[in-house]
A protein has these predicted regions:
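Acidic/aromatic-lined carbohydrate-recognition and catalytic surfaces
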Residues: 2-187, 198, 209-256, 388
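Loop/helix patches that line or flank the sugar-binding groove of alpha-linked glycan CAZymes
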Residues: 4-6, 235-237, 249, 254-257, ...
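Short beta-strand segments
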Residues: 12, 48-51, 204-208, 244-246, ...
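Conserved alpha/beta catalytic core and glycan-binding cleft of carbohydrate-active enzymes
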Residues: 105-141, 231-387, 392
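A Trp-anchored, charged/polar loop motif used as the substrate-binding/catalytic surface
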Residues: 181-192, 196, 299-310
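Active-site groove signature of glycoside hydrolases
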Residues: 193-215, 324-328
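Beta-strand-rich binding/interaction modules
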Residues: 484-501
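C-terminal beta-strand-rich structural cap/linker in extracellular carbohydrate-active enzymes
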Residues: 507-522
């Protein structure tokens, strides 16, 4: 494992919504540079920046038109280089978002691929051999190009799939992964990675990392082979570069080239039971049914989380990091279902479990999900992509543009959380996050790869549903319920309480936890 990942805490930035420095209503790279001190003081020493490459923005930048050009609305390539330099001066690493599975339909590669005559890019994308042919089970578009064929899509209509080949060949137009055209696609993506790494980028979050090869085996044999090939290149040329997969499959990703994978919010999985448990994960107006572990009155035990988490953790913890998120640009903000006190306990827990935690911009102040009309292909996700709320000035300090010209509306509620309002409040969520991350950085026992052991995780019985775990020589304990409890643990005599949220004390060698409390002993 790269040494810098052991103490890494990431901050995810949706660039168009973070901070606008030129008054056009859209956040920019200079805005990120301007807020680096805030990010560092929060306790984050690494960034994941959502797509910032040139794009028509039909899917918020996940439809790339030019992999080697910063989108003009965010700035220039020179701004990207300046961001890398400024971040590194402050001890902050920067990961860009890489979209290797598809491009925009406006990408020059795709425009060339649409031509009827054979050229360098004819097989850069997946085409059938007839304008009347279906996609063999994959979504496809036909009748829009000079070329006699239909092309395969990865997601939206605007995102033609790049050709990495097929694991199982069903049609004569499908190519094996070792076909020269498919190998050329891999090499082209390596070239993109080299371009940004040479400029100072520290690695990539990889979009839809498991989806490269079509008709792959159940264990993604051929896609995994591609990522091992890319990792071999990185290990030789950029040994400190990190890769994190959008996969939620650590048994595959961490053993095949990735340093990290996300523990994503999938309906009914362990993370979902821990933090969310919405009634309909894709609902544009989500209804939390109060069953998440951290909901005070849920009655849900920690076993719902551990039954899913522990087998995968035990199978992969020596290979890399399976990382917790507070939220991301694709999910409903956690404040939609958890109160501030519940968020405090949730953050304390995921910040002290294994892996490198990821904080989504604004979650540190409890920004709210806003039910908004879709923007740039966001649909239900749009409400989690609103401008960062810095203060109580116009547009919450995000931009000097007129309100009707900013990227998305800000939260106009009188009690909308802001950085400025919480900065001087010692009891604020913001300062709770700061103190938690400061404690994490000060104790190597909370490093991403430090030993982890479950000490006490009984099945829920009414309001009795604690969770106690060990990281190195530290013991962490949480009580999400609304009643005080005592834990039947034999504690070493020299153990002292080092950190608390709520009330916690050691009485007669027993740990007593107040209602909705968290403690670290050491």
């Amino acid at each position: 494992m790269k040494q810098w990942l052991k103490d890494a805490v990431f901050y995810e930035i949706y660039p168009q919504s973070f901070y606008d420095t030129n008054g056009d209503g859209i956040g920019d790279l200079q805005g990120i540079i301007a807020k680096l001190d805030y990010i560092r003081n929060l306790g984050c020493n690494a960034l994941w920046i959502n797509p910032c490459f040139d794009s028509p923005f039909k899917d918020a930048g996940y439809d790339v038109r030019d992999y080697k050009k910063i989108a003009p609305r965010y700035g220039t390539n020179e701004d990207a280089a300046a961001l890398f330099r400024a971040a590194h001066e402050k001890g902050i690493r920067v990961l860009f978002d890489l979209v290797p599975g598809h491009t925009s339909e406006e990408h020059p590669w795709f425009k060339a691929s649409c031509k009827p005559g054979h050229n360098e890019y004819s097989d850069r994308f997946i085409w059938t051999d007839s304008c009347f042919a279906s996609g063999d089970g994959m979504p496809f578009i036909g009748g829009e190009t000079e070329r006699n064929g239909t092309y395969i899509l990865n997601f939206f209509k605007c995102q033609p799939a790049l050709n990495y080949g097929y694991g199982k060949i069903n049609q004569k137009w499908q190519k094996p992964t070792d076909d020269p055209a498919c190998v050329a696609t891999v090499e082209a993506m390596k070239d993109v990675m080299r371009f940004w790494l040479d400029m100072g980028c520290d690695g990539f979050r990889v979009d839809m990392a498991s989806s490269l090869v079509k008709n792959d085996t159940k264990n993604k044999k051929y896609t995994c082979k591609i990522w091992r090939n890319i990792r071999d290149m990185l290990d030789v040329e950029y040994p400190e570069a990190a890769l994190i997969a959008e996969w939620n499959g650590p048994r595959m990703s961490l053993k095949n080239g990735f340093d990290m994978d996300f523990y994503l919010n999938w309906q009914g999985n362990g993370y979902n039971w821990l933090m969310r448990h919405y009634d309909g994960a894709m609902d544009s107006n989500p209804h939390n049914i109060g069953k998440a572990y951290f909901c005070k009155n849920s009655g849900t035990g920690i076993d719902k989380f551990l039954d899913d988490y522990l087998p995968a953790y035990k199978a992969t913890h020596k290979d890399g990091l399976w990382c917790f998120i507070t939220c991301n640009h694709d999910t409903i903000r956690p404040s939609a279902g958890l109160t501030t006190d519940e968020l405090r306990l949730a953050y304390a827990t995921i910040f002290t479990l294994p892996g490198a935690p990821f904080v989504y911009y604004g979650d540190e102040i409890g920004m709210r999900y806003l039910p908004l009309p879709t923007k740039e292909g966001g649909y239900f996700r749009t409400g989690s992509r609103t401008p960062m709320q810095w203060d109580d000035t116009a547009n919450h300090g995000f931009s000097t543009a007129d309100a009707q010209n900013i990227y998305l509306p800000v939260d106009t509620a009188a009690d909308a959380p802001t950085v400025a309002a919480q900065a001087d409040d010692p009891d604020s969520l913001l300062n709770s996050v700061k103190s938690l991350l400061a404690f994490r950085h000060a104790h190597a026992d909370l490093n991403a790869d430090a030993p982890f052991k479950v000490l006490y995780a009984p099945k829920a019985k009414d309001d009795y549903r604690p969770f106690v775990w060990q990281r190195g020589d530290l013991i962490c304990a949480v009580n999400p319920a609304g009643v005080s409890i005592e834990l039947p643990l034999e504690l070493a005599e020299d153990l002292k309480i080092q950190y608390t949220i709520g009330k916690a004390e050691i009485v007669n060698d027993m740990l007593s936890l107040g209602a909705q409390s968290f403690a670290i002993l050491g």
